[in-house]
Amino acid sequence: DNYLDPNAQLGTQIEMNQAPTGIGWNNIEARRWLVDYYKREQTTDGKNDSRLFYTLWYDGAASDFPEYPNQLIYGSPWNSDWGNRVFIKKYSTDASPLYYWNDNNFRSLRYADMLLLYAEALNELNATPPSKAIECLNRVRNRVNLPNIEDSKYYNGSQISTNKDAFREHLKIERALELAMECVRWVDLKRWGI
């Protein structure tokens, strides 16, 4: 019972809210477009973006990440009844949902968020993206082994790194991927007037 240890860490109900049907309440799900966006670009060693593995559960994840062939959702394999749905893995413990007692702390502020916000501010203050803005973006990308934006094989890196509007549009994508399910998307959309 999760309520027996008086010294347990006090967490949130995030796990129960996002756990798949039959395991939790399933109040929150991700959208398939997010999986597709993560899979657009491969890392420098030809693998899928690791943020996808740590953020979402979906049918096909085992083939997208063969280094983790026996992926479990709270101790259970993927259920074919879930079909093409996408569940949130971030903040989960891969164990039975822990209700309030969970030592996986909710991060309210992240360094990557600050880097991307700083890059966005620098871009808005200049006619073209300054080198410091590009450096901040690349630090976030390089952390997950993605190439510098200028060297991207999927995105038009030369345009993104030299055009203010293209850089802004790409930051919207990077923020969605890096900060998925971290309660910043609504604020981002409001700031961008979307």
Ranges and model annotations:
Residues 1-38:
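Polar, glycine-rich mid-to-C-terminal structural blocks
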